[in-house]
Amino acid sequence: MSSRIARALALVVTLLHLTRLALSTCPAACHCPLEAPKCAPGVGLVRDGCGCCKVCAKQLNEDCSKTQPCDHTKGLECNFGASSTALKGICRAQSEGRPCEYNSRIYQNGESFQPNCKHQCTCIDGAVGCIPLCPQELSLPNLGCPNPRLVKVTGQCCEEWVCDEDSIKDPMEDQDGLLGKELGFDASEVELTRNNELIAVGKGSSLKRLPVFGMEPRILYNPLQGQKCIVQTTSWSQCSKTCGTGISTRVTNDNPECRLVKETRICEVRPCGQPVYSSLKKGKKCSKTKKSPEPVRFTYAGCLSVKKYRPKYCGSCVDGRCCTPQLTRTVKMRFRCEDGETFSKNVMMIQSCKCNYNCPHANEAAFPFYRLFNDIHKFRD
């Protein structure tokens, strides 16, 4: 009797073990939902261990498995402990990652935290990366919104765009009117410029343009809607960093809806720690443009560019002048992550630089800070 019970228990244990093994193995064919899952703020999408479906990456100290991998972009890995047959583990930071100090607190590598209600941050190997939790504050207001402004909403953290009516006189109207007469602008044109509106091209014309553009823009015609659109694009802004990876932005309406949208690109004026005087020729005070001595891969969010490039960087001067990009182009660059996931980002490639004494952003603190929605940007406190 006891031998039968022992055999039955052994059979049950064997079946349970086989079931666990079956659940841990990858399917012969991938069957994924049509829509990607929606993850919490600061949580990225990664492919499961079988390379099939996109899932929300597990964060620090969360349970993980082959089908529920950890967020490798934050330096996390699934720790199964000493057991070689364990099916579930816990997301731990890789041992080589450095902790972060932010606002007088220490955070471990891979640890996520929320310093305020508007940002979700993560410690990534000694640097803190944050994403905004209020994306509407980073976007442009809708066209036709007079005097748009961000206002606080009772009981909410994020501010919202509010459109004012023309019942209250703008104190800038008199100044705009004076400037308009002196510079030859129409008063309505100045008002539309401030409101981010498109204005008519010529009298009685149904075409529109932005006053900030001096050259004639091209015309985009939508036959389905029967509308004409003047395609206009502003120049790229300065890079948000004097050295290292930064962000550059511009505004354009080059899309089927003819809507003003903000575009971003990754930029790097020069690597941090670049020697200032070593490359100067005898008698020269400036080194305008420098080319990378060897092909390099760009890095972004822990992923590497598929191709290697030899980018140009701006140099420096010894007489107080600063060197900034003069001519640039934008390259659509493909990146590949450790799990095989690929994505594309716009990247600035410098063609030439210029050096002058006009250095309004020589102080790093004076730089405008641009954020890419749903991306992580590194900065040090």
Curated annotation (Swiss-Prot):
It is found in: Secreted. The modification Phosphoserine is found at S188. Residues 98-164 form the VWFC domain. Residues 279-315 are annotated as: Heparin-binding. Residues 25-94 form the IGFBP N-terminal domain. Residues 1-24 form the signal peptide. Disulfide bonds join C26-C50, C30-C52, C32-C53, C39-C56, C64-C78, C70-C91, C286-C323, C303-C337, C314-C353, C317-C355, C322-C359. Promotes cell proliferation, chemotaxis, angiogenesis and cell adhesion. Appears to play a role in wound healing by up-regulating, in skin fibroblasts, the expression of a number of genes involved in angiogenesis, inflammation and matrix remodeling including VEGA-A, VEGA-C, MMP1, MMP3, TIMP1, uPA, PAI-1 and integrins alpha-3 and alpha-5. CCN1-mediated gene regulation is dependent on heparin-binding. Down-regulates the expression of alpha-1 and alpha-2 subunits of collagen type-1. This is CCN family member 1. The gene is CCN1.
